[in-house]
């Protein structure tokens, strides 16, 4: 099964707009019981989340998991920091790469694979404003070409 396949529960669309994603890593995530139930219900948001390496471990910050509706008073904190599970070699490689200027770890997708929640983590370099404008121009041009092609096909 290729990386990132499975039932996608949440996607960080802004990540591809704000970063050049160079590499991706599939990571496990440590969750509490009410968190996984809420995630399976699709009540999760990756929009402003980011990953950080602290004390040789990778942690995911600002991922919002809504409290489980049928949960009791022991429900989880929606914005708590969650640990990501990776191999030591991968973590060591990421430590070296993130120390370089401009690289950061960005969660791209949250999905289920064989019953386990997985996070697709991307190693990205921040885009400048002119890069974003260039991407928008390229996307608009592609859309115009497809529209013209579709219109020419309908004419025949």
Curated annotation (Swiss-Prot):
Belongs to the SmpB family. It comes from Bacillus subtilis (strain 168). Pfam families: SmpB (PF01668). GO terms for biological process: sporulation resulting in formation of a cellular spore; trans-translation; trans-translation-dependent protein tagging. This is SsrA-binding protein. InterPro entries: SmpB (IPR023620), SsrA-bd_prot (IPR000037), SsrA-bd_prot_CS (IPR020081). One of its GO terms (cellular component) is cytosol. Induction: Constitutively expressed, part of a 5 gene operon with multiple promoters. Not ethanol-stress induced. Keywords: Cytoplasm, RNA-binding, Sporulation. One of its GO terms (molecular function) is RNA binding. Disruption phenotype: Not essential for growth; loss of trans-translation. Significantly decreased growth at 16 and 52 degrees Celsius. PROSITE patterns: SSRP (PS01317).
């Amino acid at each position: 099964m290729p990386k990132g396949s499975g039932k996608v529960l949440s996607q960080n669309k802004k990540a591809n707009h704000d970063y050049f994603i160079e590499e991706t890593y599939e990571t496990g995530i440590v969750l509490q019981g009410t968190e996984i139930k809420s995630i399976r219900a699709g009540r999760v948001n990756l929009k402003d989340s980011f990953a950080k390496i602290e004390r040789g471990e990778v942690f995911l910050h600002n991922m919002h998991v809504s409290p489980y509706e049928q949960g009791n008073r022991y429900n989880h904190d929606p914005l708590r920091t969650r640990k990501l599970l990776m191999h030591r070699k991968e973590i060591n490689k990421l430590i070296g790469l993130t120390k370089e200027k401009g690289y950061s770890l960005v969660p791209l997708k949250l999905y289920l694979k064989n019953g386990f929640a997985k996070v697709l983590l991307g190693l990205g370099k921040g885009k400048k404003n002119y890069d974003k404008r260039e991407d928008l121009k390229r996307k608009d041009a592609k859309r115009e070409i497809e529209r013209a092609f579709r219109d020419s096909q309908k004419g025949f």
